[in-house]
Curated annotation (Swiss-Prot):
Gene: Mov10
Swiss-Prot/TrEMBL GO biological process terms: 3'-UTR-mediated mRNA destabilization; miRNA-mediated gene silencing by mRNA destabilization; miRNA-mediated post-transcriptional gene silencing; positive regulation of mRNA catabolic process; regulation of neuron projection arborization; transposable element silencing; transposable element silencing by mRNA destabilization
Keywords: Acetylation, ATP-binding, Cytoplasm, Helicase, Hydrolase, Nucleotide-binding, Nucleus, Phosphoprotein, RNA-binding, RNA-mediated gene silencing, Ubl conjugation
Membrane-spanning residues: none
Lineage, top ranks: Eukaryota, Metazoa, Chordata, Craniata, Vertebrata
Species this chain originates from: Mus musculus (Mouse)
Subcellular localization, as worded in the UniProt entry: Cytoplasm, P-body; Nucleus; Cytoplasm; Cytoplasm, Cytoplasmic ribonucleoprotein granule
Posttranslational modification: Ubiquitinated by the DCX(DCAF12) complex that specifically recognizes the glutamate-leucine (Glu-Leu) degron at the C-terminus, leading to its degradation.
EC number in record: 3.6.4.13
Ranges where the record places region Disordered: 966-1004
Molecular-function annotations in GO: 5'-3' RNA helicase activity; ATP binding; ATP hydrolysis activity; RNA binding
Protein name according to UniProt: Putative helicase MOV-10
Pfam families: AAA_11 (PF13086), AAA_12 (PF13087), MOV-10_beta-barrel (PF21634), Mov-10_helical (PF21635), MOV-10_Ig-like (PF21633), MOV-10_N (PF21632)
Main location group: cytoplasm
Length: 1004
């Protein structure tokens, strides 16, 4: 019958019995039956409250590692005495106090190759006494808040020869651990059977995961004088853990297992049967005059890619590899423009081919379409498709192989075309031969593909760039000084707010006059400065003052293009036309632009008017990729006099070219041709790439960022930027001055001015949840733990998720607090760089927490990645940084993950907030990054820091030493050296690293 007493109660009773024995001089008694008699007849009557039985008490002590128990003997470890004894201060060890740079590098290697240092050597090993749980090579000490636990690590020489303990290194930067060494001084000889004790006090007043490492350095057996003796190391990894109730519910559901090695195109066979493609819109009248090539990556590049990633090999051709590397490393110029950018696009596609395999499905059932009851369509559930992981759009295809035929010599592969996407389900058309034999529940092995259309139109744009000689626009050297308007023209503004903003007004006037041509005009718009407002006003003024002008207005995303349309239709309702791709879900299109886009509500489908009809509109609005349809229709090269690209810093340079090459001409002399306008911020996130090789060699640069970084026309001089070519907007209309302070200093030369509405920006300055009234930033320090589960490589941190949830309850709970404004969930955003943390936080607020899940509009609270919040703002932003472990930091740095060493991601995250910014993270780890270090110290100095104790000194150099050690592993201690840019656990087929699930493109 199970005991009615908890393990904690059993342990506490046993420790009190141990003290009872010591007080009576019976602490040396080990006879089990005599101890039972003392317990039942002497101890229990004096206990005062019901006590467990003797055997139950022993069980509790045994599982807590506080007693050694046999059928006849009991030996208590007597550790609890340490909890009440103050050891001499001279025996206390200050963690890290005597660690040299050499030893820091050694510790970094030990973090990486833990198993090697957990085993004893030469008969020397470590005995552990005290309450702990051994898990994955780590000693976990579970703590109740404000209750002390004591652990003893006894280094014992169980060998036959003497050894010498030369150094003892406890490594811990948190106050939850206190270390006391034994009586002996170091170096300390240990003969056979001798031991050296380390006593560890553990106590915490806050929840969290507090790691520590203990390293013993020893001199092995050798001749006298020890000249030939071997130095060896033994380590133990500790962690004190105190969970909040919510965090305990977020622990990994299944142990993390690395995904199996991926097999490329595993379902493709010699026999492929196709289904029916979705019907082309009956109203598709737009010409297709210019062919679009396939532009597949060259076979040789596929073969050489592993060598490019991993280094030379005897099985590769050095000459070809050297040629490719030379192309990659050469500075981008007009003479190598097409060759280099085409190569980078191929590298990106090869990475995409590899990454898409991550979503392949095995033994998944399909069913007949249950909703439309369409006998031609089958339904497949695809987890993650609603979040574009993977992206599946109407018109895309996938490959399926019957599970029952996978072992056949020549099975049939079925190519299914996507007709409809509904949340996590797709409806597919397959060949009639499959449909004729199909029954509900038939299972398949499925390979996903990605849409190559965006890549193909970028390759074509590179071809057209050279054909139309656009170098004066892409590598500008001067303006030709030709104005489109008289110098004395007066502007009547549509948006009167520009009257009080000289920078916006200046940019608009230069754009309309066109004096920058053939060079592009750049609107450099830091967060919240109104770059889209400026761009929209410029478009309206061009339409007004230049009657013959025709404008193409683009953005990389549908949301960006929709916003342009919404802003323009206010004053130009009959002059604009929004051209949408057929894959766009009409339910996602804002209602107010449906009347001026290519959706035919009567037919229930998209229409594509002929070129002649589209040319009648003064302004066409598309995404960059959809602009390729105008190129295919061969619009006259001089039709568009102006091309505007919003969010221009967020797209690859070849993507910008899709809307330029073939649609705009640059005259060799005289009239400089059309005006290109780029609006964006090079200090915020650039394009999302998958290939680290393409990223390293420049594909991550947008056209806007390249011009600002390398072209002299756009360089900042002693008097600022040249307003003829570029305007930097300076007035921030979004954030409280305190929130703006650090990013302003770090990225914008301190020039930004806080101009947000005072009432809006100060609505949380008196909130009682602030550590410091009037300072609307909170950094809540949490010593959490990085976790992973299942086969997902993405990280999550339960304690941070619980802390974020706690703040959300304070902000959104119906019972208002003093100083807190009424807040709707739609005005709150939660940002985390890891997909799994996003999922866990959503789970907390929609399932686990009773108060939050009960709110009617809780689904309006957006939880997403930094990329998903670019261009957006919320009254309140909460950020969960997730990372707490040194062990994986180098992985983040190598693959541009997380926040560390990623100033653009940091900048975007902290500048989304209007009135309140709450950051939850590990200050010890974030302090290794200079930008985060600046932010942390800013919060501390102004009273905005709370949570775990703030580190006395954020030692940036020490952190960098440890990180350096991780990336320079010694072959002598860690086995064969691995390629530095490819951590072993991330490698996939051909050495290609498996990225942590960035969202796939779903904008066409």
């Amino acid at each position: 019958m199970p005991s009615k007493f908890s393990c904690r109660k059993l342990r506490e009773t046993g420790q009190r019995f141990e003290s009872f024995l010591a007080e009576r001089g019976l602490d040396l008694e080990t006879d089990r039956e005599r101890l039972r008699t003392i317990y039942n007849h002497d101890f229990k009557p004096s206990y005062g409250t019901p006590a467990p039985g003797f055997s139950s008490m022993l069980y509790g002590m045994k599982i807590a590692n506080l007693a050694f128990v046999t059928k006849t003997r009991v030996r208590f470890f007597k550790l609890d005495r340490w909890a009440d004894v103050q050891l001499p201060e001279k025996r206390r060890i200050k963690p890290g106090s005597n660690i040299s740079k050499q030893h820091r590098s050694l510790l970094a290697r030990i973090f990486h190759d833990r198993a090697e240092y957990l085993h004893g050597k030469h008969g020397v090993d470590v005995e552990v006494q005290g309450p702990h749980e051994a898990r994955d090579g780590q000693l976990l000490i579970h703590l109740d808040l404000n209750r002390k636990e004591v652990l003893t690590l006894r280094l014992r020489n169980g060998g036959s020869k003497p050894v010498t303990l030369t150094h003892l290194f406890p490594l811990c930067w948190t106050p939850q651990f206190v270390f006391y060494h034994g009586e002996q001084d170091l170096p300390c000889p240990l003969g056979p059977g001798e031991s050296y004790e380390l006593h560890i006090y553990c106590k915490t007043s806050i929840v969290g995961y507090f790691p520590a490492t203990v390293l013993w350095e020893l001199l092995g057996p050798g001749e006298s004088g020890a000249e030939g003796a071997e130095t060896f190391y033994i380590a133990r990894f500790l962690a004190a853990v105190a969970h909040s109730p919510l965090a305990a519910q977020l622990k990994p559901t299944t142990p993390f297992k690395r995904p199996p090695r991926l097999t490329r195109n595993s379902v493709l066979t010699n026999r492929i049967e196709e289904g029916e493609r979705p019907d082309r819109a009956k109203g598709y009248e737009l010409e297709l005059s210019l062919a679009l090539g396939t532009y597949y990556p060259p076979i040789l590049l596929r073969q050489l890619l592993p060598t490019l990633l991993q280094g030379p090999s005897i099985f590769t051709a050095p000459k070809e590899v050297a040629e490719i590397k030379a192309q990659l490393e050469t500075t981008l110029k007009s003479r190598n423009y097409e060759v280099k950018l085409r190569l980078l696009l191929h590298l990106e596609e090869l990475q995409m081919e590899h990454d898409i395999r991550h979503y392949d499905l095995d033994s998944v059932p399909m069913t007949w379409d249950p909703v439309d009851q369409n006998p031609r369509l089958l339904t497949l559930e695809v987890p993650g498709v609603a979040e574009s992981r993977p992206s599946v759009l109407r018109g895309d295809h996938l490959f399926a192989l019957l599970s029952s035929e996978t072992q056949q010599d020549d099975p049939v592969t079925y190519k299914g075309f996507v007709h409809k996407v509904e949340l996590d389900r797709v409806k597919l058309s397959f060949s009639t031969s499959l449909l004729s034999r199909f029954v509900d529940g038939l299972t398949f092995k499925v390979n996903f593909t990605f849409n190559r259309q965006p890549l193909r139109v970028q390759h074509r744009a590179l071809e057209l760039t050279g054909r139309w000689v656009l170098w004066p626009m892409l590598f500008p050297v001067a303006s030709r000084g030709v104005s489109l308007l008289p110098s004395d023209v007066k502007f009547k503004l549509y948006d009167r707010s520009l009257e009080s903003n000289p920078e916006q007004l200046q940019a608009m006037k230069h754009i309309v006059r066109g004096t920058t041509r053939p060079a592009p005009y750049i609107i450099f718009g830091p967060p919240g400065t109104g770059k889209t407002v400026t761009l929209v006003e410029a478009i309206k003024q061009v339409v007004k003052h230049l009657p013959k002008a025709h404008i193409l207005a683009c953005a990389p995303s549908n949301s960006g293009a929709d916003l342009l349309c919404q802003r323009l239709r206010v004053h130009l309702p009959s002059s604009i036309y929004r051209l949408l791709a057929p894959s766009r879900d009409i339910r996602m299109v804002p209602e107010d632009i449906k009347t001026c886009c290519n959706w035919d509500a009567k037919k229930g489908e998209y229409v594509y008017p002929a070129k002649k009809h589209l040319q009648q509109y003064r302004v066409l609005i598309t995404t960059l990729i959809t602009a390729s349809r105008l190129v295919s229709a061969q619009f006259p090269i001089d039709h568009f006099t102006h091309i505007f690209i919003d969010e221009a810093g967020h797209c690859m340079e070849p993507e910008s070219l899709v809307a330029i090459a073939g649609l705009m001409d640059v005259k060799e002399t005289g009239n400089p041709g059309g005006q290109l306008v780029l609006a964006g911020d090079p200090r915020q996130l650039g394009p999302v790439l998958r290939s680290p090789l393409a990223l390293k060699h420049g594909l991550g640069y947008s056209l806007l960022e390249r011009l600002l970084a390398y072209n002299s026309l756009y360089k900042k001089g002693p008097n600022g930027y040249d307003p003829q070519f570029i305007t930097k907007l300076l007035r921030n209309y979004r954030s409280h001055p305190t929130i703006l302070d650090i990013p302003n200093q770090l990225y914008y030369d301190g020039e930004l001015q806080a101009c947000a509405d005072v009432v809006d920006r100060e609505r949380f300055c008196r909130w009682e949840g602030l550590p410091q009234q009037g300072f609307p930033i909170i950094f809540h320090g949490v010593m959490g733990k990085d976790e992973r589960e299942g086969n997902s490589p993405s990280f999550f941190n339960p304690e941070e998720a619980a802390t974020v949830t706690s703040y959300l309850k304070q902000l959104l709970a119906p019972s208002s607090k003093k100083g807190k404004a009424r807040l709707s969930p739609r005005n709150v955003g939660v940002i985390s760089p890891y997909r799994k943390q996003v999922e866990k936080i959503r789970y907390c607020i929609t399932k686990l927490d009773r108060e939050l899940r009960g709110l009617d509009d809780i689904k309006d609270l957006k939880v997403g990645s930094v990329e998903e919040f670019q261009g957006q703002e919320r009254s309140v932003i909460l950020i969960s940084t997730v990372r707490s472990s040194q062990s994986f930091v180098q992985l983040d740095l190598d693959f541009n993950l997380g926040f560390l060493k990623n100033p653009k991601r940091f900048n975007v995250a902290v500048t989304r907030a209007k009135a309140l910014l709450i950051v939850v993270g590990n200050p010890l780890l974030l302090g290794h990054d200079p930008d985060w270090k600046t932010f942390l110290e800013f919060c501390k100095e102004n009273g905005g820091y709370t949570g775990c104790p703030f580190p006395a000194k954020l030692d940036l150099q020490q952190g960098q030493d440890l990180l350096q050690g991780l990336s320079k592993l010694s072959p002598s201690t860690s086995g064969p050296r691995r390629h530095q840019n490819l951590p072993q656990e991330r490698e996939g087929e051909g050495g290609l690293p498996l990225q942590v699930e960035p969202e796939w493109r779903n904008e066409l």
